Amino acid sequence: MVRIKDIALKAKVSSATVSRILNEDESLSVAGETRQRVINIAEELGYQTVAKRRKSRGQKQRAQPLIGVLSCLSPDQERQDPYFSSIRKGIEKECFEQEIFITNSIHLGSFQEHIFRELDGVIVIGRVHDEAVKHISGRLEHAVFINHSPDPQAYDSIGIDFESASRQAIDHLFDLGYKRLGYIGGQEKEHTLKDGQSIRRTIEDKRLTAFLESAAPQPEHVLIGEYSMREGYRLMKKAIDQGHLPEAFFIASDSMAIGALKALQEAGLQVPRDTAIVSFNGIEEAEFASTPLTTVKVYTEEMGRTGVKLLLDRLNGRTLPQHVTLPTTLIVRQSCGCTAKEVT
């Protein structure tokens, strides 16, 4: 069987370049001569390019599967969101290792119909409303949903237990003796289609639900904005200006927590001396923040890899839906007042 690395070796380019050329990635900046050389070598070795695959549609013998990745975020939003970009990275790594073609980014409300006609299946990243699910299912038989399970009787899904993971973080703060807790978080969004355009609706955020049920906070100590570093900075400044900071904060994303740390530092306040922090997601930057963050680690790359495996399993004939809930790990660092350790 001809592999991408065989073509790369003969063409004297990287495997990633070969994959993107054969996947007809128009955003790839490469000389026309190099592009044609890769295509010629692939055909010479008998590798099925996307163009060949299209011609063979409808024939009995099928080529390698072509997978689409549909994101509920815009390209700019996804680039700025380490959580979702890490899920995509896991998808791309698994596809690369299994030498499976994936399409360029498809975004809800902006995809072209002809792209869906070429796909064998799609992995959807993010929460989508029933109307958007119908739009997808009307065009594709096989879909796997990451971070959302819109129809457990029909579709595979991968996610985590947000409430349980949040309670573990909150209980950790209580176990350390903190009594007055505050919350900084964003608004959980569900994406849908209206007149062909992607729109977002605010829905219940399980992290906030867990916090309100567990901590019984003062209303002024619950600060809600958008999930971004800038908003974390703004909301912590607001908390500082109100006076009487809580003894500790549960912050619903590492990005927001990094912004919050900057606001505290500018105000001459120290973490955890003046207020402690536990955050959520476990992005790489959390370890290298000005005060290393105690955080709930979500295995986002593994979510992406699992999505590919489930979709391939479906394409190979499995009919019953499967739902995977991945575990999380509490990574304890200095921001909560402890020494570093992991708590599963």
From Swiss-Prot:
PANTHER family: HTH-TYPE TRANSCRIPTIONAL REGULATOR EBGR, LACI-RELATED TRANSCRIPTIONAL REPRESSOR. Pfam families: LacI (PF00356), Peripla_BP_3 (PF13377). GO terms for cellular component: cytoplasm. Signal peptide: none annotated. Residues 4-23 bind DNA. Gene3D superfamilies: 3.40.50.2300, lambda repressor-like DNA-binding domains. Represses the melibiose operon melREDCA in the absence of melibiose or raffinose. Binds to two binding sites at the promoter region of the operon. It comes from the Bacteria. It is found in: Cytoplasm. SMART domains: HTH_LACI. This is HTH-type transcriptional repressor MelR. One of its GO terms (molecular function) is transcription cis-regulatory region binding. One of its GO terms (biological process) is regulation of DNA-templated transcription. The keyword ATP-binding does not apply. InterPro entries: HTH_LacI, LacI/GalR-like_sensor, Lambda_DNA-bd_dom_sf, Peripla_BP_I. Residues 2-58 form the HTH lacI-type domain. Induction: Negatively autoregulated. Induced by melibiose and raffinose. Keywords: Cytoplasm, DNA-binding, Repressor, Transcription, Transcription regulation.
